[in-house]
């Protein structure tokens, strides 16, 4: 009798869900998951025979299930109840940390991209520019004491060694970050490092002693939930703070050749929305020029979203910071060429997608676009940022996902 009641309940639940699904319009975008949802596939004979249609239909039904967010939360709690400490590719860790899982990668893709980095470095050297690459470790590779017991994690040192063997000039920031693992250097709910973590990495790259007391630290918001939490939306994990670090708050900032100009690198309008991390550098813009406060020449940063937080620090040391995001920057380097002849330091700050769709061809294209882009100058330097997770798995997709 009890089994019949349970079965009847679930049948009723499924029927109600199906009815609601028919009445509700499909959602295009999930604010919680920060991604586009699968849409209803078109039926074609070839796709039906190949199985493509059934795969797309399964993704569509999964993404468009009514009350999806609630189901995801319920699924996570059920997995926790049976002792699992990993859900949806996320480790559920001590101290309420959620960390992206990273255990395997394509050695072939890693080798190809290491060779491409070495080629880019050589081409820049021919222009009198030295390039340095930073391989940013994932939270799970730094905060190892918080991981579930026996949770596997890819070996950071082995990955870095491949770059070293390819003669890529690198800065190993793992030691600098690990020395401060008891501090809030990564978000609990997001894959990015915090402003504090980015600061320690910047000091390691500059080879200077960290001194946080020199900086004004302003809490921009205290209700932040990141994209990792969106995969595992546990109500027991509290919201966290996003903090700005600066010595001078107002400075001239120009986006995309003057299309939008403002007086701060912090775009506070995002703090009241669902993408609060976008407060840094106005989310992800193709081209940004920032007035600096320092006397160390001009710096070119080629970056991804990790560079948004990082950029708070070089603007205090350089006269101007020119930022390119190659995920969105599709034009030529004419404007960059005019500026580059004045740059004494060039930074290539990448989230190189060695893992998920990053192709070595992008590095080759970067070299082509920067090659010959200005006069040589003594002491020029480039820095490359490579977060681990998207770095090594090969596959299709955007070059910078």
State what each model feature region is.
Residues 1-376, 381-382, 387, 391-395, ...:
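Extracellular glycan-modifying ectodomains
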């Amino acid at each position: 009798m009890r089994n019949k009641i349970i079965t009847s309940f679930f049948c009723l639940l499924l029927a109600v869900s199906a009815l609601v699904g028919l009445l509700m319009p499909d959602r295009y975008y999930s604010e919680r998951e920060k991604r586009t949802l699968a849409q209803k596939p078109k039926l074609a004979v070839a796709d039906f025979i190949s199985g493509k249609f059934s795969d797309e239909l399964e993704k569509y039904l999964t993404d468009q299930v009514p009350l999806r967010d609630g189901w995801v939360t319920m699924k996570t709690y059920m997995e926790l109840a049976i002792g699992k400490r990993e859900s949806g590719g996320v480790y559920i860790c001590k101290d309420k940390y959620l960390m992206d899982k990273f255990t395997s990668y394509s050695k072939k893709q890693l080798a190809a991209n290491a060779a491409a980095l070495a080629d880019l470095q050589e081409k820049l050297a021919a222009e009198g520019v030295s390039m340095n690459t930073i391989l940013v470790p994932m939270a799970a590779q730094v905060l190892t004491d918080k991981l579930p017991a026996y949770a596997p994690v890819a070996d950071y040192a082995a990955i870095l060694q491949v770059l070293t063997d390819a003669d890529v000039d690198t800065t190993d920031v793992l030691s600098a970050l690990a020395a401060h693992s008891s501090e809030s250097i990564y978000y609990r709910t997001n894959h990015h490092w915090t402003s504090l973590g980015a600061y320690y990495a910047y000091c390691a790259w500059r080879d200077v002693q960290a001194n946080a007391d020199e900086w004004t630290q302003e809490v921009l918001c205290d209700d932040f939930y990141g994209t990792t939490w969106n995969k595992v939306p546990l109500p027991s994990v509290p919201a966290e703070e996003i903090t700005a670090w600066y010595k001078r708050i107002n400075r001239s900032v120009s986006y995309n050749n003057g299309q939008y100009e403002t007086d701060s690198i912090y775009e506070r309008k995002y703090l009241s929305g669902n993408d609060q991390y976008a407060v840094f550098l106005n989310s992800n813009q193709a081209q940004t020029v920032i007035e600096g406060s320092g006397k160390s020449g001009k710096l070119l940063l080629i970056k991804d979203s990790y560079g948004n937080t990082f950029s708070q620090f070089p603007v205090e040391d350089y006269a101007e910071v020119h930022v390119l995001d190659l995920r969105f920057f599709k034009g030529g380097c004419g404007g960059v060429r005019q500026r580059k002849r004045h740059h004494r330091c060039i930074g290539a700050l990448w989230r190189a997608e060695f893992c998920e769709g990053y192709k070595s061809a992008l590095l080759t294209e970067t070299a082509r676009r920067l090659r010959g882009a200005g006069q040589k100058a003594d002491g020029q330097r480039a820095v490359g940022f490579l977060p681990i997770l998207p770095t090594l798995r090969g596959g299709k997709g955007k070059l910078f996902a």
